[in-house]
Amino acid sequence: MFHKHSVEIDWGGRPLKLETGKIARQADGAVVATYGETVVLATVVAAKTPREGVDFLPLTVDYIEKTYAAGRIPGGYFKREGRPTEKETLVSRLIDRPIRPLFVDGWRNETQVIVTVLSHDMENDPDILALVATSAALTLSGAPFKGPIGAARVGFINDEYVLNPVLDEMIETQLDLVVAGTADAVLMVESEAKELNEDIMLGAVMFGHRHFQPVVQAIIELAEKAAKEPRDVKVIDESVLEKEILGLIEQDLRAAYAIPVKQDRYAAVGKAKDKVMAHYFPEGQEPQYDKLRIAGVFKELEAKIVRWNILDTGKRIDGRDSTTVRQIIAEVGVLPRAHGSALFTRGETQALVVTTLGTGEDEQYIDSLSGTYKEQFLLHYNFPPFSVGETGRMGGTKRREIGHGKLAWRALHPVLPPHHEFPYTLRVVSEITESNGSSSMASVCGASLALMDAGVPLKRPTAGIAMGLILEGERFAVLSDILGDEDHLGDMDFKVAGTDHGITSLQMDIKIAGITEEIMKVALGQAKEGRIHILGEMSKALTNARAELGEYAPRIETFKIPTDKIREVIGTGGKVIREIVEKTGAKVNIDDDGTVKVASSDGESIKAAIKWIKSIASDPELNAIYDGTVVKVMEFGAFVNFFGAKDGLVHISQLAAGRVQKTSDVVKEGDKVKVKLLGFDDRGKTRLSMKVVDQETGEDLEAKQKAEAEKAKAEGAPAAE
């Protein structure tokens, strides 16, 4: 019944198995990939006919994590998986990026990749396995895919690269880098690093490329057994049409792409396109060509003219040379009520970035396959349509916004202070108000400034820059701080973020083969120069974190109590802690290890809450003096509440100096008094005294008398001799 085929290799000290022919047999391509005990199913289905009216590759990728893979049941009322989590969205993009450029030009058939995590062993992250399984399924499917690709995760522990580090090793690694590509070329890099230098980062990329070669060979071996015949793609030779259109509008396009202002340039390009359309589609005549075809050739000519100009003249669309960064204006404190804010403008790209400080109550609970954890740093990126002068639908967060936000998050995460030193939940929001290239890197720069404006003690300011590449044969140009058009029409999108000490994040997407290690080295070196320049411009606004938090930010004090006292502080059903919060106005959060965080924008509220909690969680000191309140008057003395919920007895003989006939002659219920803790009787009852304490000043009269006696004795000693 089943026609199974499989291959198995040892990869990074663990078995990797790829199997097809048993599960999901009606899909065009289906592969079950197993690494350790992590298992994923990747399926590919491509429509039989091209989608009408599109000039792009209609590819969708969905990565899905099933909670049963980790032996868990989903939370919530419905107890089933809901909308995609942030990780599912990010991994879907991670898979999409290296496979998209490998489809044959002209493929317009709807193509869907679905990757399902079936088992997770809590050691091997499914994302790398998902990439490998997708590559294998595409290679088997018959879709015109110029693969296969391999992928690997690279760590850096104790100055050594580590292939596919397990989850426990990820805690100590200085690098989390994912690299994907073909046997000959790197296509995609995604990483977070702890301020590593360019040589280490490039070495990690090449290390990963070398070590996923066995995976590429394993997929080829599986394809030799089970691959379907590749589908034909009809490719039309447009050289004659290209030459014809070029003669019609070459000068118009060259002039348009010499206009530095984006909106004016787009208007000029639009006129050139209208000229072409009017030529090929005159009113009242039957057209010879499809409009989509003419538009596609026009778009191709746009790319060629921009690329020729850059390589021939060394000048870019806006007149810059290849290394110049656009003009930068950085401002901080631009919003009066925000805890921290910055406006970062670089050419026609602008980000308004706002930082908000929160407490433990604001932490985000993340429910992942490896367990539930709390995230204390959030970075959200918003890209409204007005930022590019367009109208558009407003609604849920798009995949691109999630991806760009995570890239900026990775850039800043390594420079944040440890949570135990700065116990705030941090939310950074980047509102892109203008965009013409590299808005994610503008978000990094603006976020760094906004965090410092809020008083967050970053290790060092962080900046980001987007690099591009034009490659034609032996000639190439690496471009610093690319425009949107240079991104779309170039061969590489290369984003680097970091401090003056090193790289914190690197993202690379390469659209063509043939980019060598040497070219990547040049790009990294040029990116470093640009990054240092941008940091210098940012320093004109702010060089370090502000010494004080913003006026409207909460203050948090942290201290510890014994774990066996947590129950007393919380009280039955939370009664005690609710009373503390209600009466002091402070927010209180208690961790399982006894760490207490007290937060309020009012310092007095914090002091009151801390005093209250400490009085419950600690024991009173012998011979210490406390403020107290008389809670009950008896014939033999008065009971005084003096230490949180603790009461003690002031015996009638300890009420005042001299003989006291009746307790009520000295105190009554509700009186505020000062008492000294004398000790505990045989039954553990607390003994207090009022007569040895000055009720006005709180001074210890016993200690005072003893000190005076010792002084008199010392002064009288010489006379006695």
From Swiss-Prot:
Coiled-coil ranges from the UniProt annotation: none
Pfam families to which the protein is assigned, alphabetical: KH_1, PNPase, RNase_PH, RNase_PH_C, S1
Gene3D superfamilies the record matches: GHMP Kinase, N-terminal domain, K Homology domain, type 1, Nucleic acid-binding proteins
One of the record's GO cellular component terms: cytosol
Residue intervals of the KH domain: 554-613
Subcellular location: Cytoplasm
A Gene Ontology biological process term: RNA processing
Record's keyword terms, sorted: Cytoplasm, Magnesium, Metal-binding, Nucleotidyltransferase, RNA-binding, Transferase
Keyword Nucleotidyltransferase: yes
UniProt enzyme class: transferase
Binding site for Mg(2+): D487, D493
Reactions mediated catalytically: RNA(n+1) + phosphate = RNA(n) + a ribonucleoside 5'-diphosphate
Entry EC number(s): 2.7.7.8
Basic and acidic residues: bias regions: 701-714
Domain S1 motif, first and last residues per copy: 623-691
Molecular function terms from GO: 3'-5'-RNA exonuclease activity; magnesium ion binding; polyribonucleotide nucleotidyltransferase activity; RNA binding
Region of interest (Disordered), ranges: 697-721
Cofactor(s) annotated in UniProt: Mg(2+)
Reported function: Involved in mRNA degradation. Catalyzes the phosphorolysis of single-stranded polyribonucleotides processively in the 3'- to 5'-direction.
Family: Belongs to the polyribonucleotide nucleotidyltransferase family.
PANTHER family: POLYRIBONUCLEOTIDE NUCLEOTIDYLTRANSFERASE (PTHR11252), POLYRIBONUCLEOTIDE NUCLEOTIDYLTRANSFERASE 1, MITOCHONDRIAL (PTHR11252:SF0)
Protein name from the UniProt record: Polyribonucleotide nucleotidyltransferase
